[in-house]
């Protein structure tokens, strides 16, 4: 607890993803006042032609930041 799931277009290497995951872990741990070790991060690549379909999996209420924000 907590878990952050990031989805993005393909094209970034593993090192870039690792750096992003570490920064997210640090920020979330600080904001939620939890130990970094309990924060997990996954990163999933989604092809551009499947992006809209992918976003439809999520309930509107779960978007706290969106393109229209």
Show where each model-derived region lies:
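A domain-level signal for the structural core that forms small-molecule/cofactor-binding pockets
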Residues: 2-69
């Amino acid at each position: 607890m907590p878990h952050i799931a990031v989805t993005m277009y393909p094209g970034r290497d593993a090192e870039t993803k690792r750096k992003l995951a570490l920064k997210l872990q640090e920020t979330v741990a600080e904001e939620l006042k939890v130990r970094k070790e309990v924060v997990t991060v996954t990163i999933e690549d989604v092809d551009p032609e499947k992006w809209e379909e992918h976003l439809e999996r999520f309930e509107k209420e779960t978007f706290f930041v969106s393109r229209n924000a």
